[in-house]
């Protein structure tokens, strides 16, 4: 999935203030899937979401789409070291259920996010988080892009899903 130079410049303009934030940079410290950091995973989801919206003319708000995709896993902990499943009562404390809430709290703490961005972050794990349903097209796009990226990253341990030529600091 290739984005044009113009599309990459658009993403850079939208996400510059978020990408430069020290807390966002901490996502580089944590592994998400395979050997892919949480930071790179979020970038992959941004690129795939943006590509889907542009190529299929889905009409999503590109700013909300990019910001929500970039912050959807802004949870800032190593989920591999969290306690494992130990009975039904601990089920909803597991990473898959709990991390959208952590990402939402961190995004609210660091940035003034919109209602669409809130919905994108809190519902990106749907249907696992069945009470948090995507209510806007941007959230549906990110939900699908996240699953696509997660499968590729987990199965193939690829650090670049959307574009194998993209540098770490490029969109």
Annotate the PLM regions.
Residues 1-171:
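Metal-dependent phosphohydrolase cores
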């Amino acid at each position: 999935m290739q984005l044009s130079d113009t599309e990459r410049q658009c993403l850079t303009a939208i996400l510059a203030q978020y990408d430069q934030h020290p807390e966002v940079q901490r996502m580089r410290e944590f592994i998400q899937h395979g050997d892919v950091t949480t930071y790179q995973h979020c970038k992959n989801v941004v690129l795939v979401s943006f590509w889907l919206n542009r190529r299929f003319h889905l009409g999503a708000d590109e700013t909300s789409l990019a910001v929500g995709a970039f912050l959807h896993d802004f949870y800032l902990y190593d989920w591999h070291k969290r306690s494992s499943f130990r009975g039904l009562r601990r089920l909803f404390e597991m990473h898959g259920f709990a991390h959208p809430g952590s990402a939402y709290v961190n995004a609210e703490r660091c940035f003034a996010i919109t209602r669409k961005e809130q919905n994108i972050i809190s519902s990106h794990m749907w249907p696992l988080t069945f009470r948090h349903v995507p209510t806007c097209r941007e959230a549906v796009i990110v939900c699908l892009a996240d699953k696509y990226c997660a499968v590729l990253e987990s199965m193939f341990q690829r650090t670049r899903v959307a574009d194998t030529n993209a540098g770490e600091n490029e969109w």
